[in-house]
Design a protein with these regions (language model features):
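Alpha-solenoid helical repeat scaffolds
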Residues: 14, 24-362, 370-371, 375, ...
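Classical Sec-dependent N-terminal signal peptides that target proteins to the secretory pathway
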Residues: 3-25
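C-terminal structured "cap/appendage" subdomains that terminate the fold
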Residues: 397-398
Length: 430
């Protein structure tokens, strides 16, 4: 057993064993030792209990004070305040800094900010530290007394450069409509000290909110170049995506073990369908999610048809086979999970169905798939077009025309394929 762990274990065991005895059988010194040890080990509940026993047995108010400090450390501010006030009542001492700090916390939590501020000024006379300035500045900020809050928080920030006080200063700048100074401070801090994941995210949100994406790009580019780790790359990529600089985002993403779906999105955004198809295939192999098998097939189709050519039947067959496998596996998963089909399922059904129809592979079966798509998304003009095209292929032009009559003319004109199909169907005499 590690020596340090062993010591802690023995100390805990000793503490437990002694407290199992009646407190009265232990000497006052022993109880002080045990309570102090518990406090310094972070066991504030045991420390509070120990000091309260000492107070009850001896009536020495110093133990009530220690119990108050333990309760405050535990987060039990109600008990801490009760004991702090008891201490003041018995001793008539209103200048004890530890007790007054407890009361400040209590007043602040109860929303009695004026009382907390008044007491803090008293504490500052005894203990003028930057930590006290920070608390006082924060209390002024909650009251929106910005002229008093800023110098205190600024003084604290300039010495410790922590993110909490940074955020408070930026808040003040924004409340005073000094956006540029707030953003400059944010950028300057990240340039000098970097940022935690939380601050980086807040910074990105802030830059985006104020439509300062170029400033965000400069900030996160420098951060990434200075320290090219996953987190910094992630935020830089986020900015590049917002700016639609997908190629640069892709180059960086390829250097890190991000979720493959990020690269998939970047490839599709750039219409790099061959790479998107390969990426979807890798995701399918890793996650066994049939949706990615379907995407692999569709992106492969897009990559082959990118040269504005119509695919041959032989080229379409493996694409159709993968889509059929994807829909079959998807049904098996849904049967187990009891989940419902969604709009992406509808998309796959329509793509598969239309392919079977358009290439005269199995028109009726293709129409069945299209009907499944329409059952999930009845308002899709693309799916209605697929069904109409199926009727046309079967020679039922009357039904095909009927379906097209339900589609708004604007929608038909907006889609070249619908426009072409409509023209052919309207000219049909069958």
């Amino acid at each position: 057993m590690d020596i340090q762990i062993k010591k802690k274990f023995l100390a805990s065991l000793l503490f437990f064993s002694l407290f199992c005895l009646k407190a009265e059988t232990l000497s006052e010194d022993h109880q002080i030792l045990l309570s102090s040890d518990a406090f310094h080990r972070g066991d504030f509940a045991s420390a509070q209990k120990g000091y309260m026993n000492l107070y009850k047995q001896t009536n020495k108010v110093v133990y009530a004070k220690e119990a108050a400090i333990s309760a405050a450390s535990l987060g039990d501010i109600k008990t801490a305040m009760h004991l702090a006030m008891l201490y003041q009542k018995i001793t008539n001492n209103r200048n004890d800094v530890s007790i007054n700090k407890i009361l400040v916390d209590g007043y602040a939590q109860m929303g009695q900010i004026d009382k907390a501020i008044e007491l803090l000024h008293k504490i500052r006379k005894e203990e003028k530290t930057i930590a006290t300035d920070n608390v006082l500045g924060t209390l002024y900020l909650t009251q929106k007394r910005l002229d008093k809050a800023f110098p205190l928080l600024n003084k604290f920030y300039n010495q410790v450069h922590d993110e909490d006080s940074l955020e408070k200063l930026i808040t003040i700048y924004f409340l005073q409509n000094r956006k540029k100074e707030g953003l400059d401070l944010l950028q300057s801090h990240i340039d000098r000290y970097g940022c935690s994941e939380q601050l980086c995210q807040k910074a990105l949100n802030t830059f985006t909110q104020f439509n300062e994406l170029d400033l965000a790009k400069t900030t996160f580019a420098r951060l990434y170049e200075k320290n090219p780790i996953v987190q910094n790359a992630q935020f830089y990529i986020g900015v590049l995506i917002l700016l639609k600089e997908f190629d640069k985002a892709q180059q960086i993403a390829e250097l890190f073990p991000f979720d493959r779906r990020l690269l998939l999105d970047l490839y599709t955004a750039q219409k790099k369908f061959a790479q998107a198809s390969k990426q979807a295939s890798l995701i399918y192999q890793e996650k066994k999610d049939p949706k990615f098998l379907g995407l692999e097939a569709i992106y492969h189709y897009e990559s082959l048809s990118a040269k504005n050519k119509r695919l041959t039947k032989q080229e379409m067959l493996p694409i159709i086979q993968k889509l059929e496998q994807a829909t079959k596996e998807r049904q098996q998963i849904l049967a187990k999970t009891k989940d419902k089909e969604d709009v992406q399922d509808a998309f796959f059904y329509n793509f598969l169905g239309y392919s079977l129809i358009d290439y005269d592979l199995d028109i009726k079966r293709g129409m069945d798939f299209v009907r499944k798509a329409l059952a999930l998304d009845s308002g899709s003009v693309l799916y209605l077009d697929s069904l109409a095209w199926g009727y046309y292929k079967l020679g039922n032009c009357l039904e095909a025309k009927k379906i097209f009559s339900s589609i708004a003319k604007e929608s038909i004109q907006a889609e070249p394929e619908l426009k072409e199909h409509n023209k052919i169907i309207q000219e049909c005499k069958k």
